[in-house]
Amino acid sequence: MIEVLLVTICLAAFPYQGSSIILESGNVNDYEVVYPRKVTALPKGAVQPKYEDAMQYELKVNGEPVVLHLEKNKGLFSKDYSETHYSPDGREITTYPPVEDHCYYHGRIENDADSTASISACNGLKGHFKLQGETYLIEPLKLSDSEAHAVFKFENVEKEDEAPKMCGVTQNWESYEPIKKASQSNLTPEHQRYIELFIVVDHGMFMKYNGNSDKIRRRIHQMVNIMKEAYRYLYIDIALTGVEIWSNKDMINVQPAAPQTLDSFGEWRKTDLLNRKSHDNAQLLTNTDFDGPTIGLAYVGTMCDPKLSTGVIQDHSPINLLVAVTMAHELGHNLGISHDTDSCSCGGYSCIMAPEISHEPSKYFSDCSYIQCWDFIMKENPQCILNKRLRTDTVSTPVSGNELLEAGE
């Protein structure tokens, strides 16, 4: 029997009350310093994989011991996952990196039925977990002591901008024929739908992260890790099938007017991207500050359409959880989901499809979202999300000099 890896966090907690530290998540007050110490319990002589399928972390939060259970988020990437960027002279360069042994996990806190966790273990521990109804973030501290991490409540991150942040969608998808409402109790694994998601990063965001493509890719992977967890409630499985970074220049006119940017991005996807890479839905991440309070926009009820199965999202926060929720929101519109009303509920939290982003982040879809999503799926039956792809999609005879790294090359 394979023994589960046990990792113990030895907590050296030094709350810096009233002081501030600058982390990737922003300026943070009142945090604790923790020192992860890995203790394995694998059989003697066993080869330890780089990233185990299951892990446990013991730590203290606010002086109380907790046990964090983590499982690798299998299926996070499609089998033909690709990454594309552009050389300074504009050549398209596409690679197919190995991603099976990745470092992204979902989890829960022991003895807390409502807890969730989304953690990257790539370079230290980075992510968030919900404990007793409160959201905590964890990330490595940039100190000479490489083992030091910070743990802090989401509410202790200083807000850069108190202005409201909203989705720009105003219309709803309406079914023209009455259909039987879906309920979670009568859905089975046969109803599962699969979305192969492609994410494009504009040149402004590339420059925002100082041209660090690795940092951008990690951020995107962490976001999709969060989205995949959220969509499980809707019986929808998300796999990231590709990332394209406009490292040389923008391929469309990215402008503050979100509707025009969305229209241009949809046309580009239809005429360019789909000819190079098969996928079900594409989202554009941009550093452009959209007009007004808008931070995202998408077409409603358009999943699988060559132009309209798209959305545009402003990279509006250093906290990847908030941007991930925004992308999950816009993808929800593509699936026919409207904004929540006061009668919608997701267990007392602000829900993903709220028209305005909440200062208390939520990873939960409401009961209204569930019904609307399956109304759309059963009425429109979008074909592209019926089955997950089981084979590599873009395989050709290896040819050197075309800047495309094919399978086998």
UniProtKB/Swiss-Prot annotation:
Principal location: secreted
Catalytic residues, chain numbering: E330
Subcellular location field: Secreted
Chain residues that bind Zn(2+): H329, H333, H339
One of the protein's GO biological processes: proteolysis
Broad enzyme group: hydrolase
Comment on bound cofactor: Binds 1 zinc ion per subunit.
Keywords: Calcium, Disulfide bond, Hemostasis impairing toxin, Hydrolase, Metal-binding, Metalloprotease, Protease, Secreted, Signal, Toxin, Zinc, Zymogen
Family named by the database record: Belongs to the venom metalloproteinase (M12B) family. P-I subfamily.
Name listed for the protein in its UniProt record: Snake venom metalloproteinase BITM02A
Organism listed in the record: Bothrops insularis (Golden lancehead)
